[in-house]
Amino acid sequence: QPLTAAVALKMKRAVRLELSRGEDFMGGMPSPACNVTLKTGATRDGQFCALDATVLMDNGIFASPWGNLLATLLGSTYNIPNARVEYSEINTNKPMGGPYRAPSAPLAAYVLESNVDLMAKDLKLDPLEFRLQNAAETGDEMINGTQWPSVNIKACLERLKAHPLYQESSQEENTGSGFAVGIWRCNVSPAGANCRMLEDGTLQLYLGTSDISGIHTGFAQVVAETLDLPLESIEVLQQDTQSGPIAPVSGGSMVSYSVIPAIREASEEVRERLLKLASDHFEASIDDLELHQGTVRVKGVPTKTVSMANLVKKAQSTRGGEGPVMGSGNCSLPENAPAASVHWVKIRVDPETGEVVPLHYLAIQDVGFALNPMLIEGQIHGGVVQGLG
């Protein structure tokens, strides 16, 4: 990609990078190869007491942080008092491994959940109740010595337990069902945001974050809600690292969580500026004013209404006035916001051809506050399809 950008700058025209399937596997940062040996121990009444894992990871020519993530997820998804993970990275003459869908999380989930199913079977315990008994909770110590922030594995399991598909699922001939827990620590980063309202009532939001998965739509929603503006009047402007506010990389499941508090703070500052301008305009107390669909009005007096655009025009055109209506925000959150999930599937297998057909699929995700449910559903559907292959 950097070479493609360099050629585009040199040629002063659009350049497209097109890879064959083989080239994509060789040079597209594929998921690292991994071998995990896992042993667990539990008491007869179903309490995990030990975990021991050995991990060998081939990350190609460069070192990577994926092993630390893998070790954390293996040793911390369930509350296991005695856990050890030995991790070795093997560097080989291959392309660097990359973050293919939450780096190392699918590997950890596959080996750990397979082991949990085997353990429940050996103990003759219900696999869901076994997981409920042992799932990590908020405040539990992770294998790296830190504590889990808010984590809702048990809530996801309880939702599965109560779901009609799970309760009513019968096993017809050549069918089977199963479920697994998934957990991702997510990340967090310092972030900033700036807002400016123009004379036509447009609100410009200046950010340093690149759009990923439609997050700029969610950012505009936050501003629109704070200022009671129509979504189409919000303009999200992505800036470069030289001129834009500090921002996290667009990855690692952290962008919205890290940036939205800064956006809210910036838009709240614009809100306070507008209320102050309207207070002077009406000679009224700020407490008696409210924002309403692009205007500021006196509560209970519909005739006393002024558009935000007019307030901005007056502020910017009056000598010695308030000047541009702007706001800035910044934040640095103290902890991650882990995302837990439980997925259940029922399949039918053709015994003659080996063809596997999914009959029902249930995805239960702790998404926190669903700022844009449609975008979230799209991400979940995409992950399910990718997981099914």
What spans do the regions from the language model cover?
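Cofactor-binding beta-sheet edge motifs in enzyme active sites
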Residues: 1-155, 162, 167-389
